[in-house]
């Protein structure tokens, strides 16, 4: 990781990763078993 990155870049990266995890969890929860 590059510590020289601006704080907003790190915040955006963290938000993006969190959003992706939640999105994947939601998709896996809502899809039928045969689609997983």
Curated annotation (Swiss-Prot):
Catalytic function, reaction form: an N-(acyl)-sphingosylphosphocholine = an N-(acyl)-sphingosyl-1,3-cyclic phosphate + choline; an N-(acyl)-sphingosylphosphoethanolamine = an N-(acyl)-sphingosyl-1,3-cyclic phosphate + ethanolamine; a 1-acyl-sn-glycero-3-phosphocholine = a 1-acyl-sn-glycero-2,3-cyclic phosphate + choline; a 1-acyl-sn-glycero-3-phosphoethanolamine = a 1-acyl-sn-glycero-2,3-cyclic phosphate + ethanolamine
Record-level Gene Ontology MF annotations: lyase activity; metal ion binding; toxin activity
Family assignment from sequence similarity: Belongs to the arthropod phospholipase D family. Class II subfamily.
Main location: secreted
Organism expressing this protein natively: Loxosceles gaucho (Spider)
Miscellaneous note of the record: LOXN1 (pI=4.41) and LOXN7 (pI=6.38) are not the same protein, but the partial sequence of LOXN7 (AA 1-9) is identical to the sequence of LOXN1.
Example of a GO cellular component annotation carried by this entry: extracellular region
EC category name: lyase
Cofactor(s) required for function per UniProt: Mg(2+)
Function summary: Dermonecrotic toxins cleave the phosphodiester linkage between the phosphate and headgroup of certain phospholipids (sphingolipid and lysolipid substrates), forming an alcohol (often choline) and a cyclic phosphate. This toxin acts on sphingomyelin (SM). It may also act on ceramide phosphoethanolamine (CPE), lysophosphatidylcholine (LPC) and lysophosphatidylethanolamine (LPE), but not on lysophosphatidylserine (LPS), and lysophosphatidylglycerol (LPG). It acts by transphosphatidylation, releasing exclusively cyclic phosphate products as second products.
Name of protein: Dermonecrotic toxin LgSicTox-beta-LOXN1/LOXN7
Post-translational modification: Contains 2 disulfide bonds.
Tissue: Expressed by the venom gland.
Known EC number: 4.6.1.-
């Amino acid at each position: 990781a590059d510590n020289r990155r601006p704080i907003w870049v790190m915040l955006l990266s963290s938000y993006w990763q969190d959003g992706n995890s939640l999105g994947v969890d939601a998709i896996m929860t809502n899809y039928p078993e045969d689609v997983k």
